[in-house]
Amino acid sequence: MYKNNRLKQIQSFLELHGSVDISALSRELGVSEMTIRRDLSILVSRGTAVRTHGGAILPRERYLGDVYMDSRSQINVAEKKAIAKAAVAELQPGDSVYIDDGSTVAAMTQFIPHNIQLRVTTTSMSAALEFNKFPNIDVIAIGGRVSKTTKSAVGPIALELLQSMYFKTAFIGVPYITVDGIITSNAIDEIHLKKAAIAQSQRSILLMDSSKIHKEPINIKLASLDDFQMVITDSRADSNFLANCMEKKIQVNIVEP
């Protein structure tokens, strides 16, 4: 593959996933890791990537921008739907649950029984509107400053309200997790809310397709596998990651798209 084509493909991976791993790119593109490092250096010089240990991420303003946020719902659509369907199976009538603003979590509305009785709390404006269509679901929309990119409530007002509530189950989506189970993010506003939702829940379920698994962490730690009682992911998930879940005695539900 010619260098220019390779650079375009690497940039495309970055735009879709928010991060790339040198080893994975080397295997995917059939070139040496040294070649990938040189390619990443070029992207860094152009201002379209930021180097991390073992890979690269999008610059913060691009990672949080409309290109990334709008495109994430188009990534691994079949996997996300299968994960969302499995997540709905964890709901029981009368549950009080927290629904995150992730694209995988948002897909749950496609599979929820029409007449199920629930109380759903969410920071996501779009999720609140979708859940409100169900006749027996009581929706609490967390208020606060609304992010222009995620269309969800963020900031101290949202955090204070969330910290005053309790849930049976929190369904949490994450942008990035290492094989060792360290969950990180660039989105500072979202980190505090996800942490609060986990802390205020009896049980937390991690919803993540296999593209979220990487070797090295980025920027800010959000949580770890130990904070979750269940992981729902797809069959392409890294075997070392799955082994780590088993070692930590975390229930894993592996779905097929």
Question: Model-derived features: where do they sit?
Answer:
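Conserved phosphate- and dinucleotide-binding cores of soluble alpha/beta proteins
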Residues: 2-12, 21-23, 32, 45, ...
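A general structural motif
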Residues: 94, 115-117, 201, 228
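Glycine-rich beta-strand-to-loop/alpha-helix junction loops that act as flexible
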Residues: 100-102
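Internal active-site segments that recognize and position negatively charged phosphoryl groups
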Residues: 107, 127
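HTH-adjacent hinge/linker in prokaryotic transcriptional regulators
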Residues: 2-9, 13-28, 34, 38-98, ...
